[in-house]
């Protein structure tokens, strides 16, 4: 699986998916009420950059305006007869784009699902914008004048009854808050905080409806229920702040369909640390109901073309990505399952690497870096069943600030054909090209693994991470693993030897690189050495049972994650276009920095076993050295 390096890959197009006005809802509630039956309809429009630049080229700017003033002018010029307010959450992102949000009003009352967002570029001009403003007939009279609407307590009763919310409202009293027609309810029980209500308009079916927005947080659901302000038994729409998602996939650690069955996994980002603060389906600006988020947009690409933004993705309003797969099906028949699997694998690996040090500042792949450094705007574009090739896969890694691109192909070596998206090792191998190219030489330089030996290590790192992750509880130092065996339908896999600590099973040493002229062969030697490193550290520290490592003083407590951490840290230390010896030294240096060198002997035992001993001298001819350093 060649990791294609395209340093000149164009930057991502502006986002073109209209977002709903709140986070995704969680589907069937524990009370048997289908919350999704009350979802908002999507009404937003979005003008991407190319269209925007053509539309607003004659827009009047003043060099004295700040980005908020410029954004406000655009809204006024677009809807000159409408009223709105500026939401107090504007900011300039790390990419230099200013973000300003507006809320439409009628008679001073918010239209709760009528928004306008404007993004201002570094040059002070409108970059992109979107809106869901109501353009129908406005109410002629101010409801606050006649006050012909129900008491908010009735709205609370209506929401509780209709949606079976476990709140007892019998003794509720509405206490006014600072905002106009906003109340909190005292005397209730069952909620985690006092319920609230606010009078708002809601656009639905081409009309405005006056409603009480009743807020109830009961843990499993945190609902905003839009109760009709005159007929309290009518609930127009519901928003649930609690984001929940289900995926039917081969779970993390299962390399391919031969190792287990697909299972249901719920909200996996809850178990993968802080790498995905917006969950896997949000980017801090929008929430998505498809296989897209801050880290990954995953889609099919049967044409093999360069366009990806509008390609097909599985969609689920309730974020339930549950699809069927069987080995008798052709890949096209299970593309929803394959895209979901790709989305799950890449997101999980992103989060694992994040905890190990592949963060925003290190150049990781995220659209929104959330103010934590790095360039952002560079998630990993992942194409499933890409039609540009077969029997392979690739990953393009431009410098930080430009998206990576993964192309996963189907394999025609079996009948029916097999989809590489279902072999996690292939996906992990490809994503690791992004890791190594961003870390070696720094995030801004993707040209540091171009030399033959360095390029070979790039391939080897991919196999190493893929193999380390697929280890199972009960595996031992004597367990062997192949690479690509399932997808290729080839017993023994696609490498010359399986990864093994047994010198009879895999006899590779560093001297074997001498006669090689292709990166995958060199990579197999490097990954073989690292497989010995991996098992030496597991023998010392154990394997660990959790997806995410536990840390003491910054070091993973188990050997598997410690090995992955040291290899990752080593990438950040080694020079541009390193050789094996320099990479060996960088890993040892990484251990010195992390653990004060506690694992030096375990590391050197692995390197020396495969010919990179302490007295190895790099030269034109690669001659093995099996010496251990003094003290070991």
UniProtKB/Swiss-Prot annotation:
Residues 1-19 form the signal peptide. GO terms for cellular component: extracellular region. Glycans are attached at residue 270. Keywords: Glycoprotein, Hydrolase, Metal-binding, Metalloprotease, Protease, Secreted, Signal, Zinc, Zymogen. GO terms for biological process: proteolysis. GO terms for molecular function: metalloendopeptidase activity; zinc ion binding. Its EC number is 3.4.24.-. SUPFAM superfamilies: Metalloproteases ('zincins'), catalytic domain. This is Extracellular metalloproteinase 2. The gene is MEP2. CDD domains: M36. Belongs to the peptidase M36 family. It comes from the Eukaryota. Its main location: secreted. Residues 20-244 form a propeptide. The active site is at residue 430. It comes from Arthroderma gypseum (strain ATCC MYA-4604 / CBS 118893). Its cofactor is Zn(2+). Secreted metalloproteinase that allows assimilation of proteinaceous substrates and probably acts as a virulence factor. It is found in: Secreted. InterPro entries: FTP_domain, Fungal_virulence_M36, Peptidase_M36, Peptidase_M4/M1_CTD_sf. It is an enzyme of class 3 (hydrolase). Binds 1 zinc ion per subunit. Zn(2+) binds at residues 429, 433.
């Amino acid at each position: 699986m060649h990791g294609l390096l395209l340093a000149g890959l164009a930057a991502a197009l502006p986002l073109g998916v209209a977002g709903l006005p709140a986070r995704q809802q969680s589907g069937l509630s524990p009370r048997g009420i289908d919350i999704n039956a009350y979802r908002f309809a999507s009404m937003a429009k979005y003008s991407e950059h190319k269209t925007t630049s053509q539309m607003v080229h004659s827009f009047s700017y003043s060099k004295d305006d700040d980005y908020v003033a410029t954004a406000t002018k655009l809204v006024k010029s677009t809807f000159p007869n409408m009223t709105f307010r500026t939401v107090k959450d504007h900011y300039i992102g790390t990419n230099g784009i200013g973000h300003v949000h507006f809320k439409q009003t009628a008679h001073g009352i918010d239209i709760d699902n009528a928004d306008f967002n404007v993004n201002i570029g570094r040059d002070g001009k409108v970059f992109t914008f979107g809106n869901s403003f109501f353009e129908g007939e406005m109410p002629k009279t101010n409801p606050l004048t006649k006050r012909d609407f129900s008491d908010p307590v009735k709205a609370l009763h209506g929401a509780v009854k209709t949606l079976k919310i476990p709140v007892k409202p019998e003794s509720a009293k509405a206490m006014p808050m600072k905002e106009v027609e906003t109340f909190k309810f005292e005397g209730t029980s069952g909620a985690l905080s006092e319920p609230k209500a606010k009078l708002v308009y809601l656009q639905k079916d081409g009309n405005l409806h006056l409603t009480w927005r009743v807020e109830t947080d009961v843990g499993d659901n945190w609902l905003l229920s839009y109760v009709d302000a005159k007929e309290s038994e009518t609930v127009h729409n519901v928003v649930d702040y609690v984001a929940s998602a289900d995926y039917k996939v081969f779970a993390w650690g299962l390399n391919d369909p031969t190792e287990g069955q697909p299972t249901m996994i719920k909200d996996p980002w809850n178990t993968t640390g802080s790498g995905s603060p917006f969950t896997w389906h949000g980017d801090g600006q929008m929430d998505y109901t498809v296989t897209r988020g801050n880290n990954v947009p995953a889609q099919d690409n049967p044409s093999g073309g360069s366009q990806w933004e509008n390609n097909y993705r599985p969609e689920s309003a309730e974020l339930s990505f549950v699809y069927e797969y069987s080995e008798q099906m052709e890949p096209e028949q299970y593309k929803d399952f394959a895209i979901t699997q790709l989305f799950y694998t890449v997101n999980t690996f992103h989060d694992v690497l994040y905890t190990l040090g592949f963060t925003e500042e290190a150049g990781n792949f995220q659209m929104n870096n959330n103010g934590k450094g790095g360039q952002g705007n560079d998630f990993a574009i992942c194409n499933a069943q890409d039609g540009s090739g077969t029997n392979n896969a690739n990953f393009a890694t431009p410098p930080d600030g430009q998206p990576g691109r993964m192309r996963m192909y189907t394999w025609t070596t079996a009948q029916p054909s097999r989809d590489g998206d279902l072999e996690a090792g292939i996906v992990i191998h490809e994503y690791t090209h992004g890791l190594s190219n961003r870390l070696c030489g720094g995030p801004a330089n993707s040209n540091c693994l171009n030399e033959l030996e360095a390029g070979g290590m790039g391939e080897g790192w991919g196999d190493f991470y893929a193999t380390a992750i697929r280890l199972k509880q009960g595996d031992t130092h004597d367990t062997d693993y192949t690479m690509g065996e399932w997808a290729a339908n080839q017993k023994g896999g696609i490498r010359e030897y399986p990864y093994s600590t047994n010198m009879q099973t895999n006899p590779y040493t560093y001297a074997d690189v001498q006669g090689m002229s292709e990166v995958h062969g060199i990579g197999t030697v490097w990954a073989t050495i690292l497989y010995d490193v991996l098992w030496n550290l597991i023998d010392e520290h154990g394997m660990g049972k959790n997806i995410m490592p536990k840390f003491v003083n910054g070091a993973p407590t188990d050997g598997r994650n410690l090995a992955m951490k040291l290899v990752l840290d080593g990438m950040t230390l080694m020079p541009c276009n390193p050789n094996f010896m320099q990479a060996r030294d960088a890993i040892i240096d990484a251990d010195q920095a992390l653990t004060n060198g506690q694992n030096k002997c375990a590391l050197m035992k692995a390197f020396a076993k495969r010919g990179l001993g302490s007295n190895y001298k790099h030269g034109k001819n690669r001659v093995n050295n099996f010496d251990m350093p003094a003290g070991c």
